[in-house]
Amino acid sequence: MKKNRVVVVQCRLSSQRFPEKAIKKLGNKTVLEWVLNSMHKVPADRYFVATDEKSYPVINEICIKNDFECFSGSLEDVLKRFCDLLQNVDAKTVIRATADNPFLFYEAAIDSVEEFEKRNKGKNRCDYLTFTGLPHGSGVEIFSKEALLKAATETKEPYDHEHVGPALYNHRDKYICDFIPSPNRYNFPTLRTTIDTYSDYLRAISIVNYCKAQDEPYTTEQILEAFNSKNVKNPVVLVPSVIKGHGTGHLHRCLNAAINKTFFVFIPYDKTLEEADSIINDYFKMGLHENQIISQLPDETYNPIIVTDTFKLTKEQINQIGVNKFLVSLDEGSDFSEYCDYLVDIIPSFDLQRNPNVFDSSFIQLPKNIKNKNEKSKSIDSIKKILVCFGGEDPSGFTIPTVNVIEKVFPSAQIVAIMSNSQNLSINYAAGINVEFVKSIQNLREKLFEYDLVITHYGLTAFEAAYAGCGVILLPTTKLHKNLAKKYNFSYIETETPSVTSVLNAFNSKNFYPNLPINTESKSLSDFVDTLSNAKKILCPICGKKSEQPDYIISRNSTRTYRRCQICGMSYMSFSLEEDKIYKKEYFFEDYKKQYGKTYQEDFESIKQQGFRRINNIKSLCKIENKNVFDIGCAYGPFLSAISDSKAIPYGTDIAEDAVKYVRNELHYPACCTAFPEINITEQFGVSHFDVITMWYVIEHFTNLDSVLRKVNASLKKDGVFAFSTPSGEGISAKSNKDNFYLISPTDHYSVWEPSKAKSILKKYGFEVVKVVSTGHHPERFPCIKNSAKEISKKSLKWKIVEKYSKLFNLGDTVEFYCVKKRNCEN
């Protein structure tokens, strides 16, 4: 039955930002084909692609395959192109889509065209209609053919002629245009599905990688599910070294990780590693998709997680990869490691002047095929087969000189030598009969066990060969490699170039069969990187700024990185793999009991007594009788109870619903379950300003302290008191073992306050620190007691002296600050 509808998809190949985007491959189809498939779901009498004359030959082929007609017209005057097409089409309703939107909500298109036609029944009239609130790139426009043809004769505005729809909706004095809020099913205005840039294209690839290629277009729900997936939200880009002289191991490691997931691998056009293309082609045969190899990095509109495997980052590379969610580096040996949010060391290194977050040799893919222990022998005659392998490149040209010497030392052995692609394999080698030169050995790791001796340099092959049970001799190519060979007990050739004597010495070394300090448990690097993609990068909670130079690294551990802000001096968690904590009933019962041996409520009276001590400190600064005291993070109310007993008026807030219910229903104090600083205190309590505001072990839980401290200032009367407690970054635990202090620091503590820096930070927010109280004194944490050969009694003189020392020099592991508001906070 005739519907009086025509679908027109607008398309050109001359886009300046991303040329030929409509014919880029997306899964097994071009971007344009995704659009055409979606628009075929919208019932119509005819389906067109409106393109320009230059694009027509390429576009027409795609149209024929997808049951669309192709029309060519003006390149620049798109309105004229549409009108020229519509002049010869019998239809009333036009459904317009564009060819750079592969993830159209076709269900929304159907609903919108039906709504348009409903509004044109009888004497009603609508000239233009579109749904608002859809993802950018998932909507269509519906308009009247008659209205558009008329509007085109009435406007000379360049914008109207370039974009079609504005010819109607920019002239609402003449045309009825309806912008209708979309139904909730389609209303996701913050999402972006269009392809206008290369970064958009990478996002589209991620969507297809998640949803998988299929003949039918994706439903609205499939597209939305993809946007919530890790693939799309947290794109991972692996950046291997493809520089001549760095070998091929970095590239192999990244490609191997990418093939098991849907990570992108960045291979720049200006690569100098000659073997790169052939290696990548090998991985295509193993299942790597061509779309996973990218030639430019995404921008901030599709912020990637960058994982570098570059040997040594350069300043140029740091600038190139500067746009990222966070930066992870593998075996990084440069002076730029402070730029790295997370460091993973896999191959044992020598004397690096920094600690990684993780050192784990189990990420080395060890061979499954291993020599029988009985096959190991140390006589010259027992060495039947030798492999000489200096990586995919051999930049120093060691292969031929080494083979020359090896043949003299092991005259009856068969020698296989891997030569780089740049070397001539047809070389007329003098000795000939026992030597075979090959360009590469497929799946070398699983064939190493076939060799009695492997001669290589320090790197993955050395560890793999040792694990496979081969004898290993290293030829150090640098002083660093010689030091590494010594440190990790490899036999190595001591002379700069191999000689018969130096090879024999290495062969007779006790380290010919090395005993390596590596974890034989095999772990998947791709799985680990996938886990890392869930992590979050955190800026300084005070300044909230990303500086050109990275903040100084204080400590790294397997789940977190800590830095010191170069602007304000705050120590803060800058990277975390931990999930955000949810403060429910369990936090105050099971979790609290695990840490302190009793539940929070069982500890109520003890905490309340601490409250009285704190109140006395507050009283030294101001009177509190009949004054309003607001406790942020009040929990089950022990401090509120102490405030009430001290004849002040308590108010509380906490994000734990059970705790707030207890305070209201059992203690009968005003409290609300509202996050700070979002709370509106006037609405909640009818109070515009408080006399005292407190936070007891709460302030360290905020990721944005700037907004918190501004809100405290705004909620506090002039000369009011702000008091808070927090772990101290200058206590004995932090001073005696900094890395352990940060390791055992709770994973939801985002800032670490230090008394020496707190005054300047708080002054910025209008507070004067009047009193600092060092608390949490633990003599048992001092090395002189902790490391003592015998147990030290709490009653002993040594214990008492250490305790006095701790208090005298403010070495408590917690600290309390008592501040007075001196001025309003500056904007």
Where are these regions (language model features)?
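Conserved core of the sugar-phosphate nucleotidyltransferase
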Residues: 61, 104-193, 199-210, 224-229
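Short, glycine-/aromatic-enriched active-site segment of Class I SAM-dependent methyltransferases
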Residues: 147, 724-751, 756-761, 777, ...
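Conserved N-terminal segment of class I S-adenosyl-L-methionine
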Residues: 534-688, 692-696, 706-709, 774, ...
